Amino acid sequence: MKLFQLTLFLLVNAFLALASSESVDVESSSNETAVEEPSTIDFDVGYNILEHLDTDLSRGVEFSMQEVATFNYSFTNNEKVNVSVVGVAGSVISTPDGYQVANITEQPIGPVPIGVNETANFQAGVQLILPEGNFYMLPVLNVMKDGEPLRVGIRPLLITVNPPPLSFFNPSFLSVQILLGLLIAGATYAFITFDKSETKRKPAKNAKPVAVDQSWLPDTYKKPEKP
């Protein structure tokens, strides 16, 4: 029994010693390897939609097909150097499957210079040439910092695209109106024609009896005259 306890004690000590040596090796190797931290940018970018100023963007926005969404950007530069916004682009992602279905056409802006700790506002319109459904719009701003181009992603916007409202002069709507007009005209004509035929069939009121010449009839067939 004592031999077993002694053997177990030696095994535990050996395991602890091995673990401590491994941890020391890992520490020393991690100290020797210099890890470069990724560079960060310090911008504060927000936006609203001019066509839906009273809408809570966190809940999504509804648009009609072919409608233009005007993004009104607010850009605050918290960097230690001046920057300039030179363009806007982005992409459109379908939901919930997450496929990219369209690109936001890149369009130049300004350039809009923004100094240190300054805020600038600018606008960019996007025409929604999309099918009916739900999508995420992912705007991207093109920024110049120290002569180097940067692409700054902004929080996505959930949008719902609905069919366009039916115009009174829409060809399909006009065809429906013409069809309804023809049906109403046909029904009116049939009613007027039927009413005229019924009027012709009615006997004349207060018609006076017409005297019939019975002189040529035999006496047997003659009606006796009323006294």
UniProtKB/Swiss-Prot annotation:
Q: Which residues lie on this side of the membrane: Cytoplasmic?
A: 194-227
Instruction: Cite the entry's keywords alphabetically.
Output: Endoplasmic reticulum, Membrane, Signal, Transmembrane, Transmembrane helix
The stretch of residues making up the signal peptide is 1-21
Major localization class: endoplasmic reticulum
**Could you list which ranges are Lumenal topological domains?**
22-172
- Matches recorded under Pfam families: TRAP_alpha
Please report the record's description of how this protein sits within the membrane. Single-pass type I membrane protein
- Region annotation Disordered: residue ranges? 199-227
Protein location: Endoplasmic reticulum membrane
Q: Name a single GO cellular component.
A: endoplasmic reticulum membrane
The parts of the chain that form a coiled coil are none
Q: Which residues cross the membrane?
A: 173-193
Question: What does this gene product do?
Answer: Is probably involved in a pathway contributing to genomic integrity.
Query: Which protein family is it in?
Result: Belongs to the IRC22 family.
Listed name of the protein: Increased recombination centers protein 22
